[in-house]
Design a protein with these regions (language model features):
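Cytosolic, long alpha-helical scaffolding segments
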Residues: 1-143
Length: 143
C-alpha cells in the first residue's frame, strides 16, 4: 500500500506541475500528511515488534528491510509534495520544453524504481538492489 501511495505521489506531483493542474497538485500536498502518518505508524509497529519479541532471522530481516525503505519512501513522497507545491507557485508556466522532458524522465524513473522495489519487497527478493542502484544513478546523472 505504501509503495502505491509513494508512486502515486510522485506521478501526481509531476503531472500536476507539468500540466499546471492545481487541483491534482493540491491533492498531492494534502495527501502527504497521510503518507507521513502511515510511515510513522509502520515504523512504530516495527520498533514495537523488535523490542518485544524473540525473532527468527527471516522476520528480523523483514523488519530491518521495512526500517530501510520506509524513510526513503517518505522522503520521496515529501519531494513529490514539494514538486506539487511549485504548481501553486506557477512554476509550470516558465518551465522550458527541455526541462519538462527532464522532469518527466526523472519522475518516470523514480516511479519505476518504487514499483520495482515494491515488487521485490513483496516477493522477498534481494535481486532488485543492483537495478535500483543503477536507476538511482540514472536520476543523479539527469540532475
Amino acid at each position: 500500500m505504501l509503495f502505491a501511495l509513494g508512486t502515486g505521489a510522485i506521478s501526481g506531483g509531476t503531472s500536476g506541475l507539468l500540466d499546471h493542474d492545481t487541483e491534482r497538485a493540491q491533492a498531492i500536498i494534502d495527501g502527504d500528511k497521510g503518507i507521513d502518518d502511515r510511515c510513522d505508524e509502520l515504523i512504530g509497529v516495527v520498533k514495537e515488534r523488535l523490542s518485544s519479541a524473540v525473532l527468527d532471522a527471516e522476520e528480523l530481516e523483514y523488519l530491518v528491510a521495512v526500517l530501510q525503505f520506509v524513510p526513503e519512501l517518505e522522503r520521496s513522497a515529501d519531494l513529490a509534495e514539494h514538486v506539487a507545491s511549485q504548481t501553486l507557485e506557477n512554476l509550470s508556466e516558465v518551465i522550458t520544453a527541455r526541462s519538462r522532458g527532464l522532469i518527466q524522465s526523472m519522475s518516470d524513473v523514480a516511479v519505476q524504481m518504487w514499483q520495482s522495489a515494491g515488487t521485490a519487497f513483496r516477493r522477498g527478493s534481494r535481486e532488485a538492489a543492483p537495478a535500483l542502484r543503477e536507476a538511482d544513478d540514472e536520476i543523479d546523472d539527469m540532475a
